[in-house]
Amino acid sequence: MKPSGFPNAERKSRPAVFLAALTLSATVGAATEAAGDSNTYGHHRWYVSATVGAGGDGSAATPFNTLAQVQQASGSGDIIIVVPSPVSVPPLDGGIALKSGQRLVGGGPAVVKFGAPLVTGGPPVVGASGLPSLPRITNTTAASNSGDAVTLADDTDVENLVITRPHRGAIYGQDAVGVTVRGNDLSGFNTSGTVGFVVQPFDLATFTPGVGIEVATGVRAGWAAILIDTANVSTSVSVSNNYVHDGVCGDGIDIRGMNIGDIGVLVTYNFITKLVQCQSVSAIQGISTQVTGASRLRATLFGNTQADNGSPGANMDRLFVNPAEAGTLIETIDHNVDITGIGGASTNGFEYILSNGNANSHVTISNSYFRNNPGDMLEEFNYGAGSRTTLVLDNVTVEQTTISGGVPSYATPPGSATITGNLGECLAISADGANDTTVLQMADSSFTGCDNNGIQVTSNHAADNGVGNIHTVIVNIDNSTINGSRFYNLWVNNLTPLTNLRVRVQDSDLSVSSSGVPVAFDQPTGTTVSAVIDLGRGTLGSDGRNCIFGGAIYDLEATQYNVTAENNWWGSARGPLPGKVVESVAGYNIDTSKSLRRAPPACNGEEPSR
């Protein structure tokens, strides 16, 4: 059984960005200040200050006093330094559009600093330095740059700035090649309530056979503090060490690929906290990635923390992944901490929704911790047609969902739930498009305190979502804990024709359901051409050694599926208790032979492998 708390990640190496993250915030401000007017690269160095009068020439001795002046005077490759001013002085207003190769840098000491992690063993958390004088800018109207404080260009850097209360975003880039955003303090963004990221249209999965609910206009989220759009170029993006907090109506960090854009992005050691949803949008998101058209996106997220995000009734998704159309999205999330989502039932720690089309995607989450959420903590939804989603969970801890939306009428016990998401699952997985392939690979992970189900997997082809059947559903669970859920710890159910189902579970604790059945496989209205469910000694190679007992009704139940479940622990040396393992339809079989005589390591026992 895996312990609670942040996962032990000693076996995982940290990338080189770790040391860079810890040292950058202490050096970037001081280094730019000490450089003075020297010009190593042959470019000009310009200064702008909120505390000087008019008539300056942009030098260190007589800075400009508006962003418009320094934007006009500076050229490609120049360095622009924002001079710190007392926090009682209004920030420089009007925003600035950078030229290629420019660096926009806040002078003076670092405006952010690293503090202790929120969870023991987690990544350090970046926050405000609390200095009396800061390099502050904003853009309070849409009169210039659409209300963004900074507009990026090719090969630009934005470092060590405090950006507060811009009309739209703090930093925006469109088809900007090779950009870096690091060590900034961003707050109060999107005072206008402008829509930014739009979750692409999708067919919402339900528990009614053949029925989906069309969400034709998608879901509108607020314009992000940092938004990078790429449609026609190939670019690399780095977003690191930023303190993104107290948003008015905006997402945190959004990366979007469109058309034929090609993006590689590194998002590291950012702290996102206290984002709220306003009335003009339907969602708010912490860190989001998206592909549409034929765009491609490769994202690496490392060492980020999200905490206390959302507002009453909000649709708050702290990590959001949205492939659509013919896009390709590959994402790795490592050493992430997410604590306390605030909002309604559609609030998630991580939502992975392939909205439509034949997009291809793969997301890996490793060495990460999620706690306290009023909706599904994790979601994998494959709503395309001919599309593929793969979710890999490696050393991931999920604790405490705080709502119970129940189960559908055909579940055990019967309930009244109608849609497959937003029920309070630790992980909800749904597929409803023709020819879809949906994969879960889970290892060395722990789900506890799931107030509805631990893992719910539903296959239900919506009749209006492509021609043909859902193609493949794969669930592979190894050395993990999913126990003590209100209803199911693991429930795989199919409502319409499915071509392939593969389920393999070994060395895992699936014990105890306070109100239902720990493990179940059901197709009350569906059929599966080829189904293999291997909980022990089956054809998929599971060694068993699972803990399956403690259900309020049954311990293991199946409807129209054969299940191999040898070499498992049923809470007793005598094997399953009478009436606790049930196949609901004659002609199918659950094989529980050769049961273990002692508890295996999965539930703190010492039964050796046979």
Give the predicted meaning of each segment.
Residues 75, 93, 99-100, 132, ...:
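Parallel beta-helix/beta-solenoid
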Residues 31-41, 559-610:
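Extracellular/surface-exposed low-complexity segments
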Residues 30-69, 84-86, 599, 609-610:
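Right-handed parallel beta-helix/beta-solenoid
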Residues 103-166, 185, 190-193, 200-209, ...:
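Right-handed parallel beta-helix/beta-spiral solenoid domain characteristic of secreted/periplasmic
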Residues 68, 76-118, 166-167:
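N-terminal extracellular ligand-recognition/capping segment immediately after the signal peptide
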Residues 95, 147-149, 169-171, 192, ...:
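Structural detector of coil-to-beta-strand junctions
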Residues 111, 144, 165, 188, ...:
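Residues in short coils/turns that link rungs of repeat/solenoid architectures in beta-rich domains
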Residues 161, 184, 242, 270, ...:
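Consensus "Asn ladder" position of solenoid repeat domains
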